[in-house]
Regions:
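Short helix- or helix-capping micro-motifs
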Residues: 96-97, 190-199
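Conserved CoA-thioester-binding segment of acyl-CoA-metabolizing enzymes
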Residues: 2-89, 125
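Hydrophobic, secondary-structure "cap" segments at the distal end of domains
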Residues: 179-189
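Glycine- (often His-adjacent) and acidic-residue-rich active-site loop
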Residues: 63, 73-81, 87-123, 142
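Glycine-rich beta-to-alpha active-site loop
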Residues: 124-171, 200-201
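C-terminal long alpha-helix characteristic of the crotonase
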Residues: 157-162, 212-263, 276, 293-299
Length: 299
């Protein structure tokens, strides 16, 4: 930091480093990054351009998050992102893949279609594995790839009347790229059923099977519920949130014996206890004060 200033280098402000987006609306407010899909005329359908913009912004958030930096602020003193809110402008969250793009894929080579599929998976994995806590605000429909976006998020609040569907089978294709993420969220039986039915489920059904986490009665309630979950997550240590995601992935991927898994959890617990956040959290508890990552309401 000091060396760069001595050499006359200008350090770019955090907000100035955000990737340029034409099909997304981006708002960074302190530690909260809000991303709004903004193809309202086509119900926020996914095409290659918006997919790439989503990849870029989620990658930027991962690289500049408080968890990645292991600090609440950057070297220049700017507050780093801890929470990402994903929503859609207009009446609908996301109607899935742009039908014209899908139709054009029939004229593409296998290699070109695989490249598109790989890019879509890069998006889903970038959301699912993001070190920030991700919140989805859903209204209208979340179909196909839109349902995939929902499945990748950590906490999903849907407005009453919203519909979710893995509708690919109605078009003679499969929910294969979104599959791993929906499968992890729903489990085998529900994924299998919905993948074959392809029909839309309402918010009550989505809540029952775990596709969403909360139902909001209207847009005002959607905002209120979002504020509540933000308040809760800001009492959690940011790097520990990232490690919780990694721990879950380790459990999902584990193919070894139970003894090795137990050894892994013991090692992880020991590392976290002795780490910066662990020491701050334990110290705060003993001293009966808030840990340094907790943001008070007035802030």
């Amino acid at each position: 930091m000091k060396n760069m200033e001595y050499l006359g280098c200008e350090i770019m402000k955090l907000i100035e480093s955000i990737p340029t987006c034409n099909l997304l609306e981006i708002n960074l407010n302190k530690c909260i990054l809000e991303i709004s899909l903004n193809r309202v005329d086509v119900f926020n359908a996914l095409n290659p351009e918006i997919i790439q913009e989503l990849i870029n912004i989620f990658s930027w958030a991962a690289n500049n998050s408080a968890a990645t930096a292991n600090s609440l602020v950057s070297d220049s003193g700017e507050i780093l992102p801890r929470i990402i809110i994903l929503k859609g402008n207009g009446k609908h969250f996301c109607a899935g893949a742009d039908i014209n793009w899908m139709k054009d894929s029939g004229e593409c080579t296998l290699e070109e279609n695989q490249k598109d599929a790989k890019r879509l998976d890069e998006l889903f994995y970038g959301i699912w594995s993001n070190p920030c806590f991700t919140v989805g605000l859903i209204k209208g429909v979340a179909l196909g790839g839109g349902a995939g976006l929902v499945a990748c998020l950590d906490h999903v609040i849907a407005m009453d009347g919203s519909k979710i569907a893995m509708s690919e089978i109605k078009l003679g294709i499969l929910p294969a790229v979104i599959g791993p993420y929906v499968y992890k969220r729903l489990g085998s039986a529900q994924f299998r059923r919905l993948a074959m039915l392809g029909s839309r489920i309402n918010t009550d059904e989505a809540l029952r099977i775990g596709f969403i986490d909360e139902i909001a009665k209207d847009e005002n309630d959607l905002s209120i519920n979002c504020e509540k979950i933000i308040s809760q997550i800001l009492t959690s240590a940011p790097s520990a949130i990232e490690q919780a995601k990694f721990l879950c992935k380790t459990f999902d991927d584990w193919n070894e014996n139970m003894k090795e898994l137990r050894d892994y959890t013991l090692k992880t617990t020991s590392i976290m206890r002795g780490g910066k956040e662990g020491q701050e959290g334990l110290g705060a508890f003993i001293e009966r004060r808030d840990p340094d990552w907790k943001i008070k309401d007035e802030e």
